[in-house]
């Protein structure tokens, strides 16, 4: 784990400038969630609008929304592909993202252009450097 101030960054994941993370699984699918920075900035989450299974997204499309006491924030698809599973636990317990943002994934995506799109994402060290500029 890398720490930048109060924010934790899990190594081995890929990151976006919009504060989503991507974990590549052995079967080639990816888990997507929001970072520690994102959940701390949002505050206590009250609701996660999960995407529909079967939804096809392009990188940068709105994947879903998360709602906190402070704001409603869009979560963007960090990779293109099809949503093949969602974390149903978040429907009843959105606070799981606040408790452990790197375990509380939002969606599993079957990517269609992973190798190319990963090149455009940051690794943990690059994301840590990016956070220092905010």
From Swiss-Prot:
Cofactor note: Binds 1 lipoyl cofactor covalently.
InterPro entries found in the cross-reference section: 2-oxoA_DH_lipoyl-BS (IPR003016), Biotin_lipoyl (IPR000089), GCV_H (IPR002930), GCV_H/Fam206 (IPR033753), GCV_H_sub (IPR017453), Single_hybrid_motif (IPR011053)
Name of one Pfam family that matches: GCV_H
Record bears the keyword NADP: no
Disulfide pairings: none
Lineage: superkingdom: Archaea
UniProt domain Lipoyl-binding: residue ranges: 29-110
Lineage: Archaea, Methanobacteriati, Methanobacteriota, Thermococci, Thermococcales
Database matches in NCBIfam families: gcvH, PRK01202.1
Residue numbers of N6-lipoyllysine PTMs: 70
UniProt source species: Pyrococcus furiosus (strain ATCC 43587 / DSM 3638 / JCM 8422 / Vc1)
Any one of the GO BP annotations: glycine decarboxylation via glycine cleavage system
Complex formation: The glycine cleavage system is composed of four proteins: P, T, L and H.
Recorded GO CC terms: cytoplasm; glycine cleavage complex
Cofactor: (R)-lipoate
Keyword terms, alphabetized: Lipoyl
Protein name as it appears in the record: Probable glycine cleavage system H protein
Cross-referenced HAMAP family: GcvH
Entry's family note: Belongs to the GcvH family.
Physiological role: The glycine cleavage system catalyzes the degradation of glycine. The H protein shuttles the methylamine group of glycine from the P protein to the T protein.
